[in-house]
């Protein structure tokens, strides 16, 4: 008989000492005690610490009493909690969704026209769910038929009342920050779980017995156990199930990603209670996500999948960036290489765009976390492998700053450098750990006359706040100026650095992408009339049906209004609204596109354009008098 296999499982990423060794079943089916394993097979592997199901019945086939979900609460109104709550409320009008946060200013912003997060399409979705809609009609001229659209009652609330918000919920989702730890054991590597711990304690105090607690935050593998233990400590007589449901949305395209996700991942125990909890959460997403895209796994697999997904996306970026350095020496064009390898169906074309590197709050943090877990498990080769992804990223941004220095003859004194783009990617106002701030810090050390920054999606306050965290020296910080338009930014500049690929900066100009419209209403007149006569696809049209109806009534129009069906209720700001008094742009493209011919007339020689995102055509810009250097290509390419 095979001997038991010992394996180590990460319980928490907070310290190297929090490791527990458990005995796993061998491949031959023996238990730790050496007796035959009679536990039933299940459709997925167990989490290491979950209780085993009865040996007489397969846990995955136990009849489960469905859990009715009437109320959901999100703890945390940030980049994950706010948009996810809005989309769930939008697609589930029968469920009351509450988002609670201790930050009163953030909650007030969610309850105003000035949302704290800039995501394309999000304001309209929030308004529909938060404020409700008017009864309206839509006329379809092709069939000469008027469709009646019923009003909708509000079902999305933002509040600072944690006790009532959590207490009423059938499902509570924890959506708080898990930044890299800055102190003690694991500093600079593992995740700081203090916010998750605090949120779990709050949930334990107020949640009703039987509530499902969902970890939505990105966490080290094994964090669900910590949450489970906190719940048991505070409420030992209550029964809670902890489920993992990591988010896979990308900032800048969050609404699109939530509307049509590649997958929804739900991790739970394989006990009857765990499966029941997973089924309840699955039912919420089933309001608009096909069942084939909702994957159920064990808790630890779910937690680890999120880290691995981000690490592998970052790995692709670093891989192509490493090749870009070779291209510049060999005379090859990295964009042509990207097209060549991206055409291989085994590789695909996504995340193969060479640039100045990746930033943001996720990729670097999650790779550090993954590497730290490997190090704790004594898998040093694995840890070093993933750290190499970050080494290339740091090398790429340092290489870019050095390129700017060389292009200006090794001297920035008395010169103005313009920065186009500060957000870590286009389509968002998130400035956390942006590539731009690292480049600016290096350039500021060269004592230029001015570093002028313009980003069409960020307010000056947001940019200065992030810069101030990285540059504390007052004389150096005084060199940095944030401008609200590209004209002020480039006037008198010797060089422009393009660091975020907003469409505003492209040359030749690139039209904003528009989604290809498809609709159930695109059929023949007879089919449309039949659909209309049935009462608009049945008595209870979904929001997806209404989106399709909007597409139908606006087809052929050059300019599509925000609210073609006139469903939205008017928004009003309170007196002395802080949002109205704050200068900001928006992530859908505030400001006009850059007129490069006008820029050329305003700049000083040598009129350098350092294109860190390969969004301009060097030959075309050079016709206007610029000298252009891109990423992964020779001068003038």
Name the predicted role of every residue range.
Residues 2-637:
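Structural/interface elements that position substrates and couple domains in central-metabolism enzymes
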